[in-house]
Amino acid sequence: MKALTTRQQEVYDLIRDHISSTGMPPTRAEIAMRLGFRSPNAAEEHLKALARKGVIEIISGASRGIRLLMEDEEGLPLIGRVAAGEPLLAQQHIEGHYKVDPSLFKPSADFLLRVNGMSMRDIGILDGDLLAVHKTQDVRNGQVVVARIEDEVTVKRLKKHGNVVELLPENSEFQPIVVDLRQQNFTIEGLAVGVIRNGDWV
């Protein structure tokens, strides 16, 4: 990898920090505003230079189409906020990679998901925890799953009967989510296989 100029390093650091804080890369306009460029075109030129040096990949056709290549991508990807209608493991959802041995979990974990909310509190899955997830659609009733209903991603206990799925919380303050498979888009994204208390590991 070629050495970066001071300005290129500033652009790279901004992209990395923006992904870390928001879960997605910045737009060209945001880069220009933050670093005092005259226009988004100036930001684009710096991005092209970074791409030539092999530290980022520019994904055409997307305003936030920037992927970091210099990051240490060993370990499990951590998924933060998930944008509506986009794949769970889309690059812009990945906050970082953490050196957690996937084989610590059975079955082995494929990614970590940052938990949002307290609906699974009573089985020890708390707001802000990192949920280890095995990517599969082969799940059974009674298992805790990561599911997508329409454009919402949730962690719940699965109960399926016929064309109806109930997603059960583990907290009496929350109501079950009932899904009619004939009328709603429903996908199993994975099986919960463990929890890392945020701050204890990463």
Swiss-Prot record:
Keywords: Autocatalytic cleavage, DNA damage, DNA repair, DNA replication, DNA-binding, Hydrolase, Repressor, SOS response, Transcription, Transcription regulation. The active site is at S119, K156. One of its GO terms (biological process) is proteolysis. The record marks A84, G85 as: Cleavage. It is an enzyme of class 3 (hydrolase). It catalyses: Hydrolysis of Ala-|-Gly bond in repressor LexA. Residues 28-48 bind DNA. Pfam families: LexA_DNA_bind, Peptidase_S24. The keyword Transcription applies. The keyword DNA-binding applies. GO terms for molecular function: DNA binding; serine-type endopeptidase activity. Belongs to the peptidase S24 family. Homodimer. Represses a number of genes involved in the response to DNA damage (SOS response), including recA and lexA. Binds to the 16 bp palindromic sequence 5'-CTGTATATATATACAG-3'. In the presence of single-stranded DNA, RecA interacts with LexA causing an autocatalytic cleavage which disrupts the DNA-binding part of LexA, leading to derepression of the SOS regulon and eventually DNA repair. This is LexA repressor. It comes from Serratia proteamaculans (strain 568). The lineage of its organism: Bacteria, Pseudomonadati, Pseudomonadota, Gammaproteobacteria, Enterobacterales.
